[in-house]
Amino acid sequence: TAVTLGGPGTLFWLWVTALIGMATKYSEVLLAVKFRERNKYGDWVGGPMYYIKNGLGKNWKWLGIIFCVFAALAALGTGNAIQAGNIVGSIHTAVLAFNPDFSGEATLNLVLGIVLAILAAVVLFGGVKRLGAVTEKLVPCMAVVYILACLAIILYNASSLPTVFHDIFVGAFTPNGVTGGAVGSMFLVISWGMKRGIFSNEAGLGTAPMAHATTSEREPVKQALYGIFEVFMDTIIICSLTGLTLLCSGIDLNYGVTGEISLVSEALGTLFTQKGGALVIAVALALFAFSTILGWALYGSRCCEFIFGSKAIRPYQVIYVLMIVVGATVDLEL
C-alpha cells in the first residue's frame, strides 16, 4: 500500500521513521522494565500506564487509564480484525492461484476465521508463558522464509537495483517525476512512509513495551537494546525487502491506487511461479499476522487489567477471540 499510494520514495521515509523509531522504542522499553510491577499472579506487568503511574506519581494514573482505553480498543481493530483479514486475504489469493474458478470466498473466510479464533483461544487461555512459547517459535520461522524469498527476487533482478534506488531517493522529494504524475505531493510520500513505518514497528505507540515488561531480564538498558533491534529487523530489513521486491520485480505498480497483498505474491511469482509466490505469501503472512494477533491480545489484556483488575482479562479475551471471526468475514481497510 505504501509503495503504490506514495511511490518508491516512501521507502526513504520509512527508513527515516525507523531511525527515529529506534530511539523511541529504546526509551519506552527501558521505562517499561524500570517501572514495571508484579500482578496478583506473580507475572511482571508494565507499559506506559505503569511508568506513568510509578514514574510520574499516582496523581497521573488517570492518564494511564486514558491510554489503556484507546489501546484496548485499538487491539480489537488494528491488532486483531485487520490482521485476520490479511490472513484470509492471502490464503484466498493462494487458493485462486491453484483454482482460478474458486467462488466460495465467503465460506472460506468464515471457516478460516473460526479456525484462527480457536487457535488463538488455545494459546491465549494458556497464559502468558504459552503465548511467549508460541510467538518465539513463529517469528524466526516466518522471518527466515520471507527474507529468503525476497532476497531471491532482488538478486534475480539485481541489474535493476541502480534504477530502483534512483527512484527511491528522487521520489522521496519529487514523487511526480517517478510515478508519472500519479503521486504529486511530497507530503503524501512522507505521510505513507511514516504511517506504514510506525504501523510495522510500533515505535512510540506504547504497545510493545507491555510485552518487553514480561521479561526475566532485570537490567532495563539490556532489554531496551532488543527494542532497537526490533525496529531494525522489522522496518529496515523486512519492510525494505518487501518494497525492493515490488520495485525490482518489474510487475505493473498502479501508483496512486491502494495496493493489495496479491502484488507481493505477483512479484514473487516472477521467479517462483504464480502458485509458488502465492503459497509463500500465504504462509509467511499467516505466521506474521497470527503472531501479531497474539501480541496485541496481551496488550489489550494488560490494559483491561490496569483499569478493572485481573477479573477483566478473561472477558476481554473472549471478545478479542470473537473479533477474529469478524475481521475474517467483514471487509475492513486500515
For each of these PLM feature ranges, what is it?
Residues 1-10, 23-58, 252-272, 298-307:
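Flexible loop linkers connecting adjacent transmembrane helices
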Residues 1-17, 208, 215, 222-223, ...:
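Transmembrane helix-boundary motif of multi-pass solute transporters/channels
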Residues 12-13, 58-74, 112-115, 145, ...:
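Select transmembrane alpha-helical segments in multipass membrane proteins
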Residues 20-42, 48-49, 53-85, 92-123, ...:
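Helix-loop-helix module between adjacent transmembrane segments
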Residues 28-35, 40, 150-167, 178-181, ...:
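Extracellular/periplasmic helix-exit of transmembrane alpha-helices
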Residues 48, 123-140, 160-165, 196, ...:
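Hydrophobic, small-residue-rich membrane helices and short re-entrant helix-turn-helix hairpins
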Residues 84-91, 107-169, 304-305, 334:
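Membrane-interface loop-to-helix entry segments
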Residues 311-334:
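A generic transmembrane alpha-helix motif of multi-pass inner-membrane proteins
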